[in-house]
Amino acid sequence: YDLYFTTRMPPFMQDAMGDVFRTDNDAKGAVKNALYIAQETGIPLSATFNNIWVRPDQKNLETFITNFKFLYDNGVRCATIPHTSWVSTGQIQREYPELEIKNTILREVSKPNEVVSLASAGFHYINLDRDVMRDRPLLDRIVEAKKYCHSKGNDIMLSLLANEHCWGGCPIMPEHYQYNATRVGSDPQYFNSTISRVSCSRWEQYDPASELKAANIPPWREDWEEFLDAGIDVFKLHGREDAMRLKESMDIIERWANHDEMMQPTFSEYMDDVEMPEAPIN
């Protein structure tokens, strides 16, 4: 397990979450906070560079390698790198040989051959697209790809995003992330902009099936255990820049540790309302 955190440094001065740090001191302060939490808790850190709209060129790669040294020297041994071409060069690994590299959820990895290609490039940890959790035959094929990678000496971990609450197959999501990752100055974050009126912020108000369309892991513990048994290694919990979602993620961790049957108890109330006691949501 690890604690992933927003990291702002050239060439990554923005990411898909959309928050703008007004000064360099703000960005450095966020890093120092993360380092302090890691020191106090013993939980390893994972630096997140979640912007596929930063040009994947050689100059930016070299800028990244130079600026990452501060984090590496302070004990960060895991990072989300958004560009396969950068990882494929091997430059990052040569400079930082102990670094474990994650891909980004923004690449929407959902095919076995994509998993094999990423493992061959040098990724250690593959974030799968959230839609995979609703397609068991596809998940089984991806797990077979993981086993194939192991047979070739490329051990990887597979991760599912557990509780982001985004709809599966959302037609707006890529544009939402692009908007945030390219916003500057005083531009509002996506969901505070007028264009978001055609997105999930409206759907959630008018579609009574909104909760059922969210690509979350179902709330029952047995469903989470089924994913582990199937070959998923990591559940990625949301909340990097959302205090309420962070609270929900911490509650899930506590419930898992306590062996509770229900990971998200709010669903109990929902089930009572629609007279669906113990009916699985799949």
Role assignments for model-derived ranges:
Residues 1-114, 124-282:
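Active-site pocket-lining/capping segments in soluble small-molecule metabolic enzymes
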